[in-house]
Amino acid sequence: MNVKACAEYLKKNDNYLIVSHKNPDGDTMGSCAALCSALRRVGKKACLYPNPQVIKKLLPYVEKYYAPDDFVPSMGIAVDVATDKMFAQGFDGKVQLCIDHHPTNSRYAKKLLLKPEKASCGEIILELIKSLCGDVTREEADLLYIAVSTDTGCFMYANTCSATLRAAAKLYDYGAEAAVLNQIFFRKKSAARLKLEGMVFSGMSFYRDGKISVVKITKDMLSKAGATNDDLDDLAGLAGMAEKSLVNVTIRELDDGSSKVSLRSSKEVNSSDICAVFGGGGHNMAAGCTINCPPDKAETMILDVINEVWK
């Protein structure tokens, strides 16, 4: 399905519940909210699934679109959700349309708008809104700027390309307050987050002459820093600050004792292939998985696979 066909499909239906993924980031939430706004502008009933895991800094931008308790949807739309295992709660068989940019999308929805060449879902939603409405409101521009900028690390990640920057420029022209949003999402941090980063950096490990960097975040570290879920956004970017690092591994201990692994890499290494060994996936240069063991063991396991794949 292309953008034009998706827009026509959305015009023919109604009563949409728009669904984000587990541990939602700026791309899934910004894209969901912008699409919701556009659908309402063309006379459709649309609401967001009120994902309980949304971090505090995102809430002011998205909670106005949350579905009320009595909302009964006729159709589910998943945005930036590569597989049905990534839903915040059970939506199996309830999603008719998926809009995504992950090349590993499992094609679980009846209809799929997939653009794996895009750095973010926000870029796809920008095209879709222009097809639906002809223009983009200032509020939608802010939401989509959040989406695009957070999925590209404020345009520092390798997934950023000329098309990404052109999309950001269009959003700026539509009124996105880029400078304000950059401060909120990339510069300002809580005291707990800064304490946690200090612990993370002091415990960073390096392998293969610094080409592989690994950081681990344990439950004990979170407790000592006084950090909450709101302080954990984009922890995966920390390992990549090492100057020689080509493969960056972030391992976070989850409440059940398992480890969430985020992997970012240069073009020489396929992150998605490595994470697929553990049932995960994502993009070539940014992927993730969950390993059912403590962080120390997860580090050994993921390093073994990296060294096997990257000779």
Identify the meaning behind each predicted range.
Residues 1-5, 78-79, 129-131:
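Short, motif-level signal for alpha-helix interfacial/capping segments enriched in acidic residues
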Residues 2-24, 28-57, 68-75, 150-277, ...:
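Hydrophobic helix-and-loop "lid/oligomerization" segment in the mid-to-C-terminal part
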Residues 35-36, 93-96, 114-115, 166:
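Glycine-rich, phosphate-binding/catalytic loops in enzymes
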Residues 49, 99, 113-114, 215:
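Hydrophobic residues at beta-strand termini and immediately following loops
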Residues 54-63, 119:
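Glycine-rich oxoanion-binding loops at beta->alpha junctions
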Residues 59-111:
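Active-site cofactor/cluster-binding pocket
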Residues 64-67, 114-116, 266-267:
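Short, hinge-like loop/turn segments at secondary-structure boundaries
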Residues 102-167:
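Short alpha-helices
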